[in-house]
Each structure stands twice: as structure tokens, then as C-alpha cells.
Amino acid sequence: MTSAPTRAPTSTADIAAAVAIDPALLAILPATVDGFPVVESPEGEAAALADPILPSVGRAVAAGFAIDPAIGDFVYAVVVQLRPGALPDEAFRDWRDSFDEGACSQADGVVGHAETEIAGRTVYIGTCAGGLRTYHVLLKDRDVLISASAAGERRLGELLIENLRP
């Protein structure tokens, strides 16, 4: 008896089901940020899977979180293993806008965007009215996207991006 061949995902539901949670992606992030451990965030992964854009661009996702418990500064990062060719410039802008809107929705909205270089990588930074910042890095050679949000004077978002592992 033979089994039916596996079909490629064709519908949005099929594609969403094909996005895996892969904690191994967290190895791209530094183990610590300013001395605070980066730990997997199942809540963040669940939120990422609910993003309507993710299934069209990502094959796998992981989320990590680091916090200074004494003062509440934090960084939250989503690492996405991209589908080959799925994130051209326009789609990357859409991703950033969607991520920034979501991150800033509880911080009084997006008030600015900037582009800079950190550790030799182009980084897109969003600023929320409430002080939260977002960071986006596209590692084209690895088909990986990292989007992070951070709050606080310690600038944990910048430190996370600065210390990404090769």
C-alpha cells in the first residue's frame, strides 16, 4: 500500500500551517544583552504566527526576550527564516510598517523612521511616541529577518543588533 504524495501548500491556511517554530533560530541572537539572558518567548512566537504577513514570507520563526528586572528595560526579538525570494524591498517595507504599527500601538503610535548602520549591517529603526523603538535587520545571505522592539535607557535593542552572531 502506498500513501498519497504530499502536496505543496497552496492556500493561506496551508502556508500558515507550514510556518514552524524553530528555537534554533535564536542562536543568531546574542546569548545575553548587556548581561541579561535572551530567553525564548512562546508568547512572542504565538503572536508572530498570528501575523497575517508571516506565512507569505517565513518558513520558521522564533522569538526571544531579555529584560533588566530592576528597571524594566527590555528587548523583544523575532527571528524569521525567510522563504527564498519572498521578501523583496516592498514586502520588507510592508513587514517593517506592520511590525512597527503593532509594537507602537500601545506606545501612542509611530512617530518616526530612520536608517543607520550597526556593526556593518543596515538597520531600520522605528520610533514610537511612548519611547519604544523597533529595529529591523535583513540578513540576505542567510535568508533571515530579525525584527526587535526595545524600551529603556540601556538601549538593549541596539546592543542586541550590534551583537548578532554570524
Language-model regions: role of each:
Residues 61-95:
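A short acidic-to-branched-hydrophobic micro-motif
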Residues 101-102, 126:
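Extracellular secreted precursors and ectodomains with disulfide-bonded cysteine-rich loops/domains
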Residues 59-60, 72-76, 133-135, 142-144:
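Short, surface-exposed beta-edge/turn micro-motifs
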Residues 105-106:
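Well-ordered mid-protein domain cores that form the structural environment of catalytic cofactors
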